[in-house]
Amino acid sequence: MNPDEVNRALGHYLNDADSGELVVEDSTTVQVKNPEARKTGDKIEVFYSRKTTVVSPTNSDDEDADFCSDSELLPQQEGHRSRATSFAGRIRAGSDDEAMPKHTILRYRRKKGGQWREINLQGTPDKRKDDEDELEVDVKEDRSEQTGIVTKTYEARWKVLKYEHLPEWLQDNEFLRHGHRPPLPSFSECFKSIWSLHTETGNIWTHLIGCVAFFFLACWFLTRPDNHIQFQEKVVFSFFFAGAVLCLGLSFAFHTLSCHSVNVVKIFCKLDYMGISLLIIGSFIPWIYYGFYCRREPKITYIAMVSVLGIGAIVVSLWDKFSESRFRPIRAAVFVGMGCSGVIPTIHYIITDGVHSLFADNSFHWLLLMAFLYLLGAGLYATRTPERFFPGKCDIWFQSHQLFHTCVVIAAFVHYYGISEMAFARLNEQCPVR
């Protein structure tokens, strides 16, 4: 990266301030989001943001105020040096009698390797070509009537990108061709993006809604009077509620922040996988507890078994390469294998109590439906169906990850209903005297 090019771009506004304005404060933030790339030779990504405070002459009724915005994430292409690009435009400064803030939106486009050009938003809509990048600059000007000080802020708005325009660390599913968020190295910008339409919108909202629903369901359940639901049952169900809320909440956070930066993605990706393991553990505990309600030894043994398997899955998910796209089938296999460990206590129960009791007393039909939904979702996720067969047609809706999320939320509610029936049946029976 050439520092002179960066300095030249960031100083563009000061060089163009020829309207008699006195610059009082000019603050620029430059963040290198992947400094390790200097050693590895990978693409360098830089984020620029700028805020300028100027004093304008009191007789500048008809003068224009120059502005520029240097807020853009600039990936360094292989074989080329990274370049910082400035954007220049004009807005009317107005009179001193007008103390109202001014707000202008400008839009720029450029071809690959070309110069940015301003698009006229007032005239005939200019259709964007496939080989062009687009950027919106949000300009806000706040003038003080008493002092004549003008505070200007510039914000570059992100646009959804095609898959091939993404940096390598954001290229997860090549069958989703368009509608991706660009890198947004700002937590506030990432969370603002949940209100926009892009490839992660469905993934974010499916688990956000599920997380909120389970949170309030848990609050209702755990605050019931003890003569309705005893404290011991509240403790047992708490494992399931905690697993569901953490799994869905961490998944929501990961998909919201998945475009922030490499390091943030690595952290929240591991938390996302940890949440899946916690949901599996939390789902097993009440089922085993009520399934072997009158038998302490198998109850303790199987709860310990699933806890150890869950911890093992968490340890495996901490491996950095575990989150890579090529390990997608292995990820699905790890969690499916952990869920299938429930076959062992099921066979035990059939041997001791029979198949009829398994369905009549343990609501096993609901657990089978839950297992089917989890396996269906995992299968769609691992094979990237349906977008594999319709590339570019499922970019926003009905992609495999959204369907997987939907299956998870529905399966969790099915499981809650099933273990509730199990608990009701067990609490209304007497354990046999042994």
Curated annotation (Swiss-Prot):
<comment type="function">
    <text>Probable receptor, which may be involved in metabolic pathways that regulate lipid metabolism such as fatty acid oxidation.</text>
</comment>
<feature type="region of interest" description="Disordered">
    <location>
        <begin position="74"/>
        <end position="103"/>
    </location>
</feature>
<protein>
    <recommendedName>
        <fullName>Progestin and adipoQ receptor-like protein 1</fullName>
    </recommendedName>
</protein>
<feature type="transmembrane region" description="Helical; Name=3">
    <location>
        <begin position="274"/>
        <end position="294"/>
    </location>
</feature>
<feature type="transmembrane region" description="Helical; Name=2">
    <location>
        <begin position="235"/>
        <end position="255"/>
    </location>
</feature>
<feature type="topological domain" description="Cytoplasmic">
    <location>
        <begin position="321"/>
        <end position="331"/>
    </location>
</feature>
<feature type="topological domain" description="Extracellular">
    <location>
        <begin position="295"/>
        <end position="299"/>
    </location>
</feature>
<dbReference type="GO" id="GO:0005886">
    <property type="term" value="C:plasma membrane"/>
</dbReference>
<dbReference type="GO" id="GO:0009755">
    <property type="term" value="P:hormone-mediated signaling pathway"/>
</dbReference>
<dbReference type="Pfam" id="PF03006">
    <property type="entry name" value="HlyIII"/>
</dbReference>
<dbReference type="InterPro" id="IPR001610">
    <property type="entry name" value="PAC"/>
</dbReference>
<feature type="region of interest" description="Disordered">
    <location>
        <begin position="118"/>
        <end position="137"/>
    </location>
</feature>
<dbReference type="GO" id="GO:0019395">
    <property type="term" value="P:fatty acid oxidation"/>
</dbReference>
<dbReference type="GO" id="GO:0033211">
    <property type="term" value="P:adiponectin-activated signaling pathway"/>
</dbReference>
<keyword id="KW-0472">Membrane</keyword>
<keyword id="KW-0675">Receptor</keyword>
<feature type="topological domain" description="Cytoplasmic">
    <location>
        <begin position="256"/>
        <end position="273"/>
    </location>
</feature>
<dbReference type="GO" id="GO:0038023">
    <property type="term" value="F:signaling receptor activity"/>
</dbReference>
<feature type="transmembrane region" description="Helical; Name=6">
    <location>
        <begin position="363"/>
        <end position="383"/>
    </location>
</feature>
<dbReference type="InterPro" id="IPR004254">
    <property type="entry name" value="AdipoR/HlyIII-related"/>
</dbReference>
<feature type="transmembrane region" description="Helical; Name=7">
    <location>
        <begin position="404"/>
        <end position="424"/>
    </location>
</feature>
<keyword id="KW-0812">Transmembrane</keyword>
<feature type="topological domain" description="Cytoplasmic">
    <location>
        <begin position="384"/>
        <end position="403"/>
    </location>
</feature>
<feature type="topological domain" description="Cytoplasmic">
    <location>
        <begin position="1"/>
        <end position="201"/>
    </location>
</feature>
<comment type="similarity">
    <text>Belongs to the ADIPOR family.</text>
</comment>
<dbReference type="GO" id="GO:0046321">
    <property type="term" value="P:positive regulation of fatty acid oxidation"/>
</dbReference>
<feature type="transmembrane region" description="Helical; Name=5">
    <location>
        <begin position="332"/>
        <end position="352"/>
    </location>
</feature>
<keyword id="KW-1133">Transmembrane helix</keyword>
<keyword id="KW-0276">Fatty acid metabolism</keyword>
<feature type="topological domain" description="Extracellular">
    <location>
        <begin position="223"/>
        <end position="234"/>
    </location>
</feature>
<feature type="transmembrane region" description="Helical; Name=1">
    <location>
        <begin position="202"/>
        <end position="222"/>
    </location>
</feature>
<feature type="topological domain" description="Extracellular">
    <location>
        <begin position="353"/>
        <end position="362"/>
    </location>
</feature>
<feature type="topological domain" description="Extracellular">
    <location>
        <begin position="425"/>
        <end position="434"/>
    </location>
</feature>
<feature type="transmembrane region" description="Helical; Name=4">
    <location>
        <begin position="300"/>
        <end position="320"/>
    </location>
</feature>
<keyword id="KW-0443">Lipid metabolism</keyword>
